[in-house]
Amino acid sequence: MSLLSPACDPAREAALVTGAGNGIGRAIAQALVGEDVRTVFADVSEERVMAAVKASARPELAIPFVGDLASPAVREALLKHAQSALGRVTHFVHSASPPRREADHAMAVSTETWAQMHAVNLEGGFHLSRELARELIAAKTPGSFLLLTSLHSGTPRNLPHYSTAKAGMAMLVKELAKTFGRHGIRVNALVPGAIAAGGFVADPSLARHIPLGRLGQAEDLAPMALAVLSNRVSAYVTGAAIVVDGGLSLTNWFEPPEI
């Protein structure tokens, strides 16, 4: 196929994006709508999600949903809402994650904050993926799932509730990719780093540690997300972790050479 061909097939595909009210989730959801894909925008904030829908290239293709995905009942309601609005979800993006506070280090994070982070990220990602896959398998329909993890799924962040939740998601991607692959459902991870969006507070001084010399924006993730989600572009890619970090993960205590 030509790389200039459309990434998606709007006649056969429909999407569900969590965390679609801001940051990376919003950018990916809007990019899907920009490809003419009917997309459910799910977020915990009604104000944010309605603003994201309104700002989309084709708001008539964007379906809002408001609810806290830490709740199993809300997750079930989201699945029913998506099925009612779209018929069948073929593309799933799990970007929802509670806010991070630098104060929540290992000696300070509360039991409630820990549970909320894991419930939204790991439990939400697992249960939504499993139920969406169940529908696709029954219908013998291929699908593509993308879970947002983090560089800190493998390196400490001083936020143990966040890092452990993302580490769990990284392994979840591999487990689901292996289980669902024979049914034509691909599951991959998108690994952002130093993206000025969502819970990350951008510190301009960080840019000097990034080989590409700048902080990333949520929009830097959207083209890669579309490519990985696309069954036309990435038909043979599953269980992969795609890093989009401007080279931040290459950083160590050595400075680059003067050339």
PLM-predicted stretches and their roles:
Residues 35-51:
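Conserved glycine-rich Rossmann-like NAD(P)H-binding loop of the short-chain dehydrogenase/reductase
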Residues 12-13, 88-91, 136-150, 182-185, ...:
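Active-site loop of short-chain dehydrogenase/reductase
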Residues 21-22:
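Conserved glycine-rich cofactor-binding loop
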Residues 107-126, 146, 169, 211-212:
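Catalytic Tyr-X3-Lys loop
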Residues 218-244, 249:
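C-terminal substrate-recognition "lid" of short-chain dehydrogenase/reductases
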Residues 98, 144-168, 173-182:
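Catalytic loop of short-chain dehydrogenase/reductase
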Residues 76, 97-115, 158-161, 199-201, ...:
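Conserved mid-core segment of classical short-chain dehydrogenase/reductases
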